[in-house]
């Protein structure tokens, strides 16, 4: 039982947040014991810089737009250009929902090829205030279409992911609002297959593609930041993010009849994020 049913508003808020938070550990797949794990020992350091506009079109209804630039390790090259348009609605003081569209112009690090993506997102968020402290749980479902050539046996053309975030902020240092959060990202439809590893010859045999039904936790993000409310209309956000990334790397031929290599890859990176927002 998550919580005793109560007519008290705070109890209802906590119950909603607890139900949403139950998704935090969902969709994590069991790892096959015979799949090797490769750990990238290099700690990446990247940058994200953004500018956004938030328009309060009607009571509780907000329309937003944002441009973001991300860099590769040590700011050596552009990793992506990203533009988004969103619509959110404040249902009540403790519940919000919204939808977003994002265009992602991504550049592959190895050969700098352009890899455009289109992403549609829907989110729900529960909010609970305790004095100057604010807690929130946000669940975001992302549908991403990859509009470039890919091997369908190695990668998913239309991926479905769930991002689950718990955030804590303190509003007692106005105009500065420090915050911290942790976010889990689960993928729902990565490639699935059957295969047997021949240890004598060090090759994979009896490979069979089974569709897109592998689910697993593929990223943990933690963040420390602060939002500086310069005026009622202008604010700047500073943050340092840490990512633990976990992916299943698959190498097959284009016909999907032979599995050449298979391993899990773990990597870590830090990201410096600076964002400006104009609200009106």
Give names to the regions the model predicted.
Residues 49-55, 85-89, 99, 122-128, ...:
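Residues on the lipid-exposed face of transmembrane beta-strands in outer-membrane beta-barrel proteins
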Residues 33-39, 60-75, 80, 96-109, ...:
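Transmembrane beta-strand segments that form the barrel wall of outer-membrane beta-barrel proteins
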Residues 36-41, 72-76, 109-114, 151-157, ...:
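Outer-membrane beta-barrel domain signature
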Residues 77-133:
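Hydrophobic/aromatic-rich structural module bridging two neighboring secondary-structure elements via a short loop
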Residues 28-32:
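Sec/Tat signal peptide C-region and signal peptidase I cleavage site
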Residues 43-49, 79-83, 116-120, 154-162, ...:
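Residues that define the transmembrane beta-barrel architecture of outer-membrane proteins
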Residues 59-65, 93-99, 131-135, 174-178, ...:
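Repeated loop/turn-to-beta-strand initiation elements of outer-membrane beta-barrel proteins
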Residues 140-257, 277-280:
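Outer-membrane beta-barrel transmembrane domain signature
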């Amino acid at each position: 039982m998550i919580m005793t049913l109560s007519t008290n508003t705070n109890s209802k808020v906590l119950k909603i947040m607890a139900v949403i938070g139950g998704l935090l550990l969902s969709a994590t797949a069991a790892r096959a014991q015979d799949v090797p794990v490769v750990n990238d020992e290099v700690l990446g350091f990247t940058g994200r810089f953004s500018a956004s506009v938030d328009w309060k079109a009607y009571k509780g209804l907000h329309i937003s737009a944002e441009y973001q630039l991300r860099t590769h390790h040590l700011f050596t090259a552009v990793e992506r250009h990203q533009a988004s348009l969103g619509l959110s609605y404040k249902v009540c003081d403790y519940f919000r929902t919204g939808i977003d569209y994002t265009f992602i112009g991504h550049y592959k690090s190895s050969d700098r090829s352009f890899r455009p993506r289109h992403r549609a997102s829907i989110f729900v968020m529960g909010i609970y205030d305790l004095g100057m402290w604010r807690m929130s749980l946000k669940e975001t479902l992302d549908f991403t279409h990859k509009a470039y050539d890919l091997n369908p046996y190695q990668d998913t053309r239309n991926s479905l992911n769930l991002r689950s975030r718990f955030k804590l902020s303190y509003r007692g240092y106005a105009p500065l609002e420090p915050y911290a959060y942790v976010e889990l990202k689960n993928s729902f439809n990565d490639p699935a297959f059957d295969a047997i590893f021949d240890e004598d010859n060090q090759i994979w045999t009896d490979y069979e593609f089974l569709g897109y039904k592998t689910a697993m936790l593929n990223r943990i993000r933690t963040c420390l930041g602060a939002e500086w409310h310069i005026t009622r209309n202008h604010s700047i956000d500073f943050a340092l993010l840490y990512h633990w990334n976990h992916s299943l790397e698959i190498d097959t031929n284009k016909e999907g009849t032979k599995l050449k290599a298979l391993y899990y890859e773990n990597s870590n990176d830090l990201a410096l994020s600076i964002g400006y927002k104009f609200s009106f």
